A protein has these predicted regions:
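Conserved N-terminal phosphate-binding loop of PLP-dependent enzymes in the Aspartate aminotransferase
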Residues: 1-188
Length: 188
């Protein structure tokens, strides 16, 4: 583990046994922390220089940010992209997308999909992709995300001693609280 942006430390902890750097483009469980584009670009440079893979985990954020993948706006091309959640529209489905360099090492039987042989999962995935590829889908995600962001900012402004920050991109949003989250969870 390393603090994002501390690329000098990262370079020092990479050894000859390091195969890849893997990061969530938006850290979901880590507090909806968006990895800045400059950071993703630097990670790509480091991986290229060290001849290791860059894995950008899109399990939680793919299709939900206003673009197909959250990393797209950075211009970075990862070697491996795990996806799930959004691709199944709530139905269990996941996949592992790889570039040509990585695909050479994948032989028959290599794990590339969760529920991939399940006809229902594949039908659901196809239906989700049909919706995602509809005209203006991503524009609508951005528009609704802005509306959501504005609403959350109003709540933050109303409760400045409780809410520190509104985070997120598109429809992935989170609030950084100034009070213990357990208080709110208990009241649910």
């Amino acid at each position: 583990h390393f603090k994002f942006g501390d690329h000098n430390k990262l370079k020092k902890i990479i050894t000859s046994k390091t195969a890849a750097i893997m990061v969530e483009t938006i850290m979901g469980e880590g507090g909806i922390k968006v990895i800045p584009n400059w950071c993703l670009k630097e990670l790509r440079k480091i991986c290229d220089k060290k001849k290791i893979l860059l894995i950008l985990d899109e399990v939680q954020c793919a299709y939900r940010t206003g673009s197909f993948f959250a990393f797209e706006k950075s211009g970075v091309n990862p070697d491996i992209v795990p996806i799930a959640k959004g691709i199944g529209g709530g139905f269990p489905l996941g996949a592992c997308l790889v570039n040509k360099k990585v695909s050479i090492g994948m032989t028959p039987g290599t794990h590339g999909s969760t529920f991939g042989g399940n006809p229902l999962a594949m039908a659901v995935g196809n239906a989700v992709l049909d919706i995602i590829f509809e005209k203006d889908f991503f524009k609508n995600v951005e528009k609704k995300g802005e509306y959501f962001q504005d609403g959350l900012k109003k709540i933050k402004d109303k409760y400045p001693k409780i809410i520190e920050e509104v985070r997120g991109v598109g429809l992935i949003k989170g609030l950084k609280m100034l009070v213990d989250n357990d208080e709110f969870i208990k009241k649910l």
